[in-house]
């Protein structure tokens, strides 16, 4: 990501409510690549993903009720600097596109896959043209596809929040759909991601505040959940991993983003946020991508880079987090100023 990112100018009401959130983000563990980029003019943004090339971003806009079949959902496309290049790059009701309430997305090669109620749709990421439509079995009532994860081997996984199910899709076999797991313990699976080490599925629960691990054959294990006397999580929405294997989870109701480090320590890296939905991580540019569902905006911000130069016991400075520049290094002897 280039360092001369230009901050979007917010409309007055949003600017007043949003600036304090940015301050909290900066002070709780995120760094700023030049300037944090804010994106406005959205409509109920749900998911924010990056092209693996690091040259483009996409935001899904529900534009109405999350279960409405109104054919007015759209996808916003941004360039490498986070500037909107096409607000309605893909739009329901235009050019025979049927797109009701687009939620989770995943990029695989040239195809942008989008979860839309009871169908998975694939569009060409360059032209925006529809490439494939995948329908799902209706064995479980209340089909509500929520998020998508792409595995390294080419398989896709889709969460179904209403049916407490996870589906596996094989694009190489004509996008065949198989039910991977149907279990009430999923408790409304929302965001899903692939664990970078185990290649297991990780999903977060909307209803019970759980984080669950799912093996390739559908075996469930609870990684984290609320205790009897504690309510750490409420309505978990998004989950993703950075390039070092740290996990990030968003709670849309509590307005928090959590980080779970590789040694299973939890940290709140941002709070008092206005409904952070299905977050994404740009692992190429080390950025967190946050859609703010109820204020119709989104944000790109830098993540802390782990430092191996300091021991765990050594105090870290603001420079380690990127908030202030580090002190200048002494110049070699004989160098003229």
List the model feature ranges, each with a label.
Residues 35-38, 85-95, 131-138, 176-182, ...:
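A short beta-strand motif characteristic of beta-propeller blades
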Residues 63-67, 119, 163-164, 208-209, ...:
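Short glycine/acidic-enriched loop and turn motifs that connect beta-strands
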Residues 280-324:
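Blade-level signature of beta-propeller repeat domains, shared across WD40, Kelch, NHL, RCC1
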């Amino acid at each position: 990501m280039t360092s001369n990112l230009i901050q979007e100018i917010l409309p007055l009401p949003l600017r007043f409510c949003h600036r304090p959130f940015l301050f909290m983000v900066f002070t709780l563990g995120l760094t700023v690549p030049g300037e944090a980029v804010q994106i406005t003019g959205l409509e109920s943004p749900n998911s924010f993903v990056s092209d693996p090339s690091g040259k483009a971003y996409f935001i899904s806009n529900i534009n109405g009720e999350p279960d409405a079949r109104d054919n007015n959902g759209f996808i916003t496309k941004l360039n490498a600097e986070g500037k909107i290049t096409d607000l309605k790059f893909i739009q329901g009701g235009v050019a025979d596109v049927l797109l009701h309430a687009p939620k989770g997305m995943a990029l695989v090669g040239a195809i942008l896959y989008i979860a839309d109620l009871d169908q998975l749709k694939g569009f060409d990421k360059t032209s925006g043209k529809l490439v494939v439509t995948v329908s799902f079995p209706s064995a479980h009532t209340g089909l509500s596809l929520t998020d998508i994860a792409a595995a390294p081997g080419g398989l896709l996984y889709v969460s179904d929040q209403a049916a407490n199910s996870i589906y596996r899709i094989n694009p190489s076999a004509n996008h065949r759909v198989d039910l991977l797991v149907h279990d009430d313990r999923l408790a409304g699976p929302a965001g899903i991601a692939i664990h970078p080490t185990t290649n297991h599925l990780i999903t977060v629960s909307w209803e019970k505040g759980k984080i669950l691990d799912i093996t390739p054959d559908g075996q469930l294990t609870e990684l984290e959940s609320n205790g009897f006397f504690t309510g750490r999580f409420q309505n978990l929405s998004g989950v993703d991993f950075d390039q070092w294997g740290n996990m990030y989870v968003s709670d849309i109701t509590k307005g928090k983003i959590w980080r779970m480090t590789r040694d299973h320590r939890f940290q709140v890296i941002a709070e008092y946020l206005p409904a952070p939905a299905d977050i994404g991580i740009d692992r190429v540019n080390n950025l967190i991508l946050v859609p703010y569902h109820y204020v119709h905006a989104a944000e790109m911000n830098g993540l802390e880079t782990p430092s191996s130069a300091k021991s765990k016991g050594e105090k870290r400075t603001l420079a380690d987090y990127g908030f202030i520049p580090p002190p200048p290094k002494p110049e070699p002897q004989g160098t003229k100023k």
